[in-house]
Amino acid sequence: RDPKIAKIYPDGIHGAIAKYLRSRPGFEVRTAALEEPENGLSDKILNATDVLVWWGHMAHDKVSDAVVERVYHRITGEGMGLIVLHSGHYSKIFRRLTGTSCSLRWREAGEKERLWVVAPGHPIAEGIGDYFEIEHTEMYGEYFDIPSPDELVFISWFPGGEVFRSGCCFYRGIGKIFYFRPGHETFPIFHDPNVLKVIENAARWAAPVDRPRPATILGAINVKPLEKLS
């Protein structure tokens, strides 16, 4: 709706990300939008989804609670991956998964961001140098009210002096979640090769593992001993 944003992303942010991923081997991509029935995330669609990429801004409260619960159980109980981008930190699903407010400092001044790789052996950092820079972006700063990440891949620095945990991995149930900070809508960040490469890497990392689901994922079970008890 904003002409400035439409000029940067004529097919929407979701369209820009989808276009890139469709160009990469091994990806079959579809998009979902808030205004679609069930926010575009019906049981049928989610059951056919290995990894869900989530970007949202200003309309988090308009996402159906039923859809959020559906996504939550698909992640924790069935292993679907989730990638949360930028202002998606305030999405219902990310806060449901973290159990925290996910609040932070912010400033919109078009300043530079330098993202340092702090886990160089992590698959999400594959193909990325020691750091990369985004010339103009919105600042996010600590304290970021999230649980301590299970793995931290990137830390951002901003000229105003702030730092931010900008690439955070979490495990919930049998699902994998990656939060990635870059992505303010008024800048062409989702055309940046490094940003797109990280999203691609994260999607491959977050994809479900092909193995039987643990019996205890859906609830506690009473079991017989594997060995003879004396």
Give the residues covered by each predicted segment.
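Aromatic-Pro/Gly-enriched surface loop or interdomain linker
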Residues: 1-49, 217-230
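Short, solvent-exposed loop/turn segments at secondary-structure junctions
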Residues: 1-2, 37, 59, 89-91, ...
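Short, flexible loop segments at the rims of nucleotide/cofactor-binding pockets, characterized by
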Residues: 29-34, 57-62, 156-157
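Charged helix-capping and loop-helix junction motifs
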Residues: 13, 66-69, 193-195
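Oxidoreductase and adenylate-handling cofactor-binding alpha/beta cores
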Residues: 97-102, 132-149, 194-211
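Catalytic beta-strand/loop cores that center a nucleophilic Ser/Cys/Thr
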Residues: 19-22, 28-30, 47, 103-181, ...
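Short alpha-beta junction capping motif
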Residues: 2, 44-92, 174
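Extracellular ligand-binding/catalytic regions of CAZymes and related secreted enzymes
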Residues: 164, 172-230
